[in-house]
């Protein structure tokens, strides 16, 4: 089955956002959640939009396991809004020579592809 989350659609990203979307997500339990992220810093996962950050945070909170999928350019990038502590999700990323990635590996599982 496919479940569609309601709420408002943010036109620039086609993301469902808003209170209705959050309420619906809170009613669900996820075994695994896969999310994109705009930035991964030393301590936090970040995104530029407050409403999208709230959606992502709610999904992470309702998942047994969370995975953040990013390309190497997102490592060390910081966006406006903190989504969650780095420890809250596993990171799936391209192999990177970033020294920051070594620090992140001390805090959470990193899968390099």
Give the location of each predicted region.
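Conserved phosphate- and dinucleotide-binding cores of soluble alpha/beta proteins
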Residues: 1-113
């Amino acid at each position: 089955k496919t479940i569609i989350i309601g709420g408002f659609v943010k036109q620039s990203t086609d993301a469902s956002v808003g209170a209705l979307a959050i309420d619906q997500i809170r009613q669900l339990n996820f075994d695994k959640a896969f999310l994109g992220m705009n930035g991964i810093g030393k301590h936090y996962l970040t995104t530029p939009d407050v409403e999208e950050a709230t959606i992502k945070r709610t999904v992470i909170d309702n998942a047994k396991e969370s995975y953040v999928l990013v390309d190497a350019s997102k490592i060390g990038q910081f966006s406006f809004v903190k989504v969650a502590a780095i420890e809250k999700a596993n990171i799936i990323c391209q192999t990177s020579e970033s020294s920051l990635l070594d620090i992140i590996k001390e805090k959470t599982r990193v899968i390099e592809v």
